[in-house]
Amino acid sequence: MLDVNFFDELRIGLATAEDIRQWSYGEVKKPETINYRTLKPEKDGLFCEKIFGPTRDWECYCGKYKRVRFKGIICERCGVEVTRAKVRRERMGHIELAAPVTHIWYFKGVPSRLGYLLDLAPKDLEKIIYFAAYVITSVDNEMRHNELSTLEAEMMVERKAVEDQRDADLEARAQKLEADLAELEAEGAKADARRKVRDSGEREMRQLRDRAQRELDRLEDIWSTFTKLAPKQLIVDENLYRELQDRYGEYFTGAMGAESIQKLIETFDIDAEAEILRDVIRNGKGQKKLRALKRLKVVAAFQQSGNSPMGMVLDAVPVIPPELRPMVQLDGGRFATSDLNDLYRRVINRNNRLKRLIDLGAPEIIVNNEKRMLQESVDALFDNGRRGRPVTGPGNRPLKSLSDLLKGKQGRFRQNLLGKRVDYSGRSVIVVGPQLKLHQCGLPKLMALELFKPFVMKRLVDLNHAQNIKSAKRMVERQRPQVWDVLEEVIAEHPVLLNRAPTLHRLGIQAFEPMLVEGKAIQLHPLVCEAFNADFDGDQMAVHLPLSAEAQAEARILMLSSNNILSPASGRPLAMPRLDMVTGLYYLTTEVEGDKGAYQPAGQDSPETGVYSSPAEAIMAADRGVLSVRAKIKVRLTQLRPPAEIEDALFGHNGWQPGDAWTAETTLGRVLFNELLPLGYAFVNKQMHKKVQAAIINDLAERYPMIVVAQTVDKLKDSGFYWATRSGVTVSMADVLVPPRKKEILDSYEERAEKVEKQFQRGALNHDERNEALVEIWKEATDEVGQALREHYPADNPIITIVDSGATGNFTQTRTLAGMKGLVTNPKGEFIPRPIKSSFREGLTVLEYFINTHGARKGLADTALRTADSGYLTRRLVDVSQDVIVREHDCQTERGIMVELAERQGDGTLIRDPYIETSAYARTLGADAVDEAGNVVVARGEDLGDPEIEACLAAGITQVKVRSVLTCTTGTGVCATCYGRSMATGKLVDIGEAVGIVAAQSIGEPGTQLTMRTFHQGGVGEDITGGLPRVQELFEARVPRGKAPIADVTGRVRLEDGERFYKITIVPDDGGEEVVYDKLSKRQRLRVFKHEDGSERVLSDGDHVEVGQQLMEGSADPHEVLRVQGPREVQIHLVREVQEVYRAQGVSIHDKHIEVIVRQMLRRVTIIDSGATEFLPGSLIDRAEFEAENRRVVAESGEPAAGRPVLMGITKASLATDSWLSAASFQETTRVLTDAAINCRSDKLNGLKENVIIGKLIPAGTGINRYRNIAVQPTEEARAAAYTIPSYEDQYYSPDFGQATGAAVPLDDYGYSDYR
């Protein structure tokens, strides 16, 4: 077998008949499979042991040779080689065909490769191949030319003879007619009888003339066909062909079926044809040039690849190994077989029948029919259903052909090569494990025992609990007591991987240290639920076991959950307190006025109370029950750092040191909370809303090592759960309070609604106006009920606590629960003007319930559709970007992109850019950030973290130049400096990081949160596409719905306002030609934008527009942006538009992820003029390859190729990849493989997908070449331990040999006397 680690490219080509015969171990001659009595394979059949190898290890068919000692012998009785049975998975056979057949992929694919090569229309080709027309294969022009006059004379003689014969016959008939008429006249017959005789005579003469004319026409037809006869000419009329064959057979050859195609290919001169086509392309125009270009693609492919086009017509068909198309016996003695066996049997049956017919010398028509059937059976074997009706099995099910085995989700690529089942894995339901540390998970004992079985067995033998592996296995199966102790020992420090489907981003698989737990459910740490998107309502998770030391090291260092706190999409922590924990910490840090033991200032006759000398004293007071944790107190602190402003005031420039005392006015709860934070973190004296907690953890992640952050979030989790329990937050019906003012509020609005109804009935309002008015009224009513609700609820109401703390829910839900549901929409997305006045607490009326179901059902249907769409989008994104890997540290480019940090207002103040988090943050500076005085604030090459951004803003810098993957010049992949900081680690990205896949996951994972809706914007006719459809539209580079024109030039606008359309003319500033935009629908409305004077208003006559400016509402077409403004602008446009959709849903994704995808969309150049290069005009070439080839040509002082950048959608870009393995496993498998085989494509195995398919380590992360051949050396200590010299003491040697030091003994001065 091939060792996958030792080849680095994979080439695919066309197999010739010779190749097929070379691969084969023998010819399959019979359609039989196995003998149904003996169940042994039939000789020479589809499962023959002689061809494919023995069915039992080391045993021949007849049983003469058994056992391994006869290895390699070929039995002289049955001819079977004695070897392993697994060779039946790799040995191929073949079928020798009695007549050649064409390969359906090359004839029927679009475009038809055979048709392009031979310059035949696919329809004509089909007629030839399926025996409906003859084709002329060759003409002896010279001989025909020499003998043309003689042949013409012969033809003239023949024609003369026909004419003479005709004339003679007519003459004789005319005379007979005359005689008959004369006889009738003599008899005095009636005029009627005479007329009948004359008519019949004339009719016969007419028939004579017609017959002769037909004969003459036939001769004319034969002659004209013969004189114009040329190769590749079709003759559909069989009689005409027979005549030509009889008369002029020596001047030409012709045939039908695949044989004729084979002959045409044999005589085809590829080089000459390529030269002719290149000439046509250079000098031709229009359709002719286009056709020549398409044909040259196929011809040049054969010319350059050295493939023989003969491979498109087969003389032999390979038979794949029998184990890959098995036949198995079912219960009840019936057999189940792979469809391929049926298809092969059809081929063999027809082939054998054809051989017999040829031997019998059957008539041509019968032989041709059999050949056609053979062609059809081979077509069905290769690609069933591609032409005509598919061959069906029992129950009218189309049989699965070789092509179907590769295609689609169930095909070989996606089912078995990209998605394999894994050993050492298990799955179970998950429950919460609040007692766990962040890096731990609870593993059920039984599951752990099964997973670690081999490890446990080995350890049992090592510890002498069992004599051998077999008895150890028995011990494990019987679950003896010793087994559990050994299991504890084995799982220590051996991480396991937990995965929850769907794995939408890389945090869907994380490593944990297992802790054994009773029961059968896996226990999961509550803080990782966010990353897995898990909850405990019955979710299941899978466990996988990393086996090798390397795998364990990767799991522990790279995948351990405590090292994966940050989101790879935004760089913000995902392991945040949620739900109960938020409620607990919120409760703990709330300050309640005048609570038990609160601080009281000193009165005239009373000392101040609620003052404590240390947190310990305060805790003691709380334990005694005299102080509430939520009461305000004064406390002296020595171990907590004061907030910045207090620190400056109290401790000056030296700053606070641990042990320095200061007094805080706070609550005991807040002191307890601050004790959870790392030492030296400034005291936070606030109520802990979820957002505040998030900000703190964010800050910790920026400033402290991951291990500290992990410990802190664990402490926050424990404290959160503890205080959530103490707080007694529960929800009961009694907590849902309906505001008493609700009825009077609704009554007042009901009156207003009635007034509107009356106006409508009087005709003062039309239907739409009435609806709008009602919707406004009821929106106000709902808001007012909400306000009344808010005022009526006490602050410590559990529902309000849950909502206010940010734990879950929002105020709208509270209002629905206790106030009123308000307006709902119908399926079209319009508000129904009757509101739902009841709350869920009171219960809905039947009508209210009914109108509420509209929205609810639409929501559910939407979610289901969205999930599938979002998954498909992720799949396409991953496919387009899977080979973007960080390849080097720095590409040394000077280029970069400008990003905004802030906007300067009119009064000179700076307003921080709201999206700085996702644009400038975590990038590398491409040029020094300089303030107005010219001082460098942040130097080039620095990483922009929060402190650096703050420094720039403080220095008044509004924009900086940063490195970006869009301007990176690394050939394949990107460089670390252009990519910048890895969002997941907070450090510069490592070489080998698969940033493409991280980008695809970051964009795809929140896809399910995006809406499916198209938004109705008041009065706009065209819907504005939003949500997921908009993201797809952008990444597929489609022309958007309701596309808006953009200005091609800078100039003044002349606006003509028609009845239904606008006409915009731009008069260019440079005096060039005017640009006219005609028929712009008024429903789309003109664009509002900022004018030169700073005002915002609609585009109007006489305005000045810049190049690329949008003129109407809607979305610009990215292809136009590329044409008008160039690649840089279209990149910025796409990134901005995608971000707009995600920001609308409150999803934070860093720009760099979108840039990685956009870079892949703009990787190619379309060739306009090939110059002196090998490129074909119109072909799409990778930019790096294009530039390299041009440099080479210019160096040889040739003419470089001219090309223009092209924007490709992600599906098209995935299929245009250089890796045929990756493209074939993505979509359109047969088309990709056909194309790759003709071009003899070579896959360099650069991407991840190709390597997964062939089973190599992926070239990313620890799989990149620099880590491939690392040899691990033991340390000195390990070496010393391994090679210690045993102490043999005195029982082995005499005392003279020294005290077991291992020192050499000088034998010369050693006495041998004692031993003699």
UniProtKB/Swiss-Prot annotation:
Note accompanying the cofactor annotation: Binds 1 Mg(2+) ion per subunit. Binds 2 Zn(2+) ions per subunit.
Supply the Pfam families for this chain. RNA_pol_Rpb1_1 (PF04997), RNA_pol_Rpb1_2 (PF00623), RNA_pol_Rpb1_3 (PF04983), RNA_pol_Rpb1_4 (PF05000), RNA_pol_Rpb1_5 (PF04998)
Give me the residues that bind Zn(2+) 1, please: C60, C62, C75, C78
Read off the InterPro entries from this record. DNA-dir_RpoC_beta_prime, DNA-dir_RpoC_beta_prime_bact, RNA_pol_asu, RNA_pol_N, RNA_pol_Rpb1_1, RNA_pol_Rpb1_3, RNA_pol_Rpb1_3_sf, RNA_pol_Rpb1_4
Q: Which residues bind Mg(2+)?
A: D535, D537, D539
GO BP: DNA-templated transcription
Cofactors (names): Mg(2+); Zn(2+)
Taxonomically, which superkingdom?
Bacteria
Per UniProt, where does Zn(2+) 2 bind? C891, C968, C975, C978
* SMART domains attached to this UniProt entry: RPOLA_N (SM00663)
Give the catalytic activity: RNA(n) + a ribonucleoside 5'-triphosphate = RNA(n+1) + diphosphate
Which GO molecular function entries does the Swiss-Prot or TrEMBL record give?
A: DNA binding; DNA-directed RNA polymerase activity; magnesium ion binding; zinc ion binding
Enzyme class (EC, first level): transferase
The UniProt transmembrane annotation reads none
What are the protein's UniProt keywords?
A: DNA-directed RNA polymerase, Magnesium, Metal-binding, Nucleotidyltransferase, Transcription, Transferase, Zinc
Q: Any idea of its EC number? A: 2.7.7.6
- GO cellular component assignments: DNA-directed RNA polymerase complex
Please state which protein family the record places this protein in. Answer: Belongs to the RNA polymerase beta' chain family.
Its job: DNA-dependent RNA polymerase catalyzes the transcription of DNA into RNA using the four ribonucleoside triphosphates as substrates.
**Quaternary structure and partners:** The RNAP catalytic core consists of 2 alpha, 1 beta, 1 beta' and 1 omega subunit. When a sigma factor is associated with the core the holoenzyme is formed, which can initiate transcription.
Q: What is this protein called?
A: DNA-directed RNA polymerase subunit beta'
